[in-house]
C-alpha cells in the first residue's frame, strides 16, 4: 500500500495567482478547512510546495 498524506487548506484562494488556484483544485481542495488524502508522490509534493502558504500537511 502506498504511503498517503493528509492535506488541509488553511487559507483562501481568493486573490491568488490563477496557477495556484488550479493547483489547489488539482489537489482536490475546494474550501478552507477541507482535508483530502493523497498518495505521497513527487508530483503531489511539488504541488504542495507551490501552495505551501495555503495548506497544512500531515504525514
UniProtKB/Swiss-Prot annotation:
GO cellular component: cytosolic large ribosomal subunit
Keyword terms, alphabetized: Ribonucleoprotein, Ribosomal protein
Domain of life of the native organism: Bacteria
GO biological process: translation
Xref: CDD domains: Ribosomal_L30 (cd01658)
PANTHER family: LARGE RIBOSOMAL SUBUNIT PROTEIN UL30M, MITOCHONDRIAL RIBOSOMAL PROTEIN L30
Complex formation: Part of the 50S ribosomal subunit.
UniProt similarity note: Belongs to the universal ribosomal protein uL30 family.
Name of the featured protein: Large ribosomal subunit protein uL30
Organism: Edwardsiella ictaluri (strain 93-146)
Lineage, uppermost ranks: Bacteria, Pseudomonadati, Pseudomonadota, Gammaproteobacteria, Enterobacterales
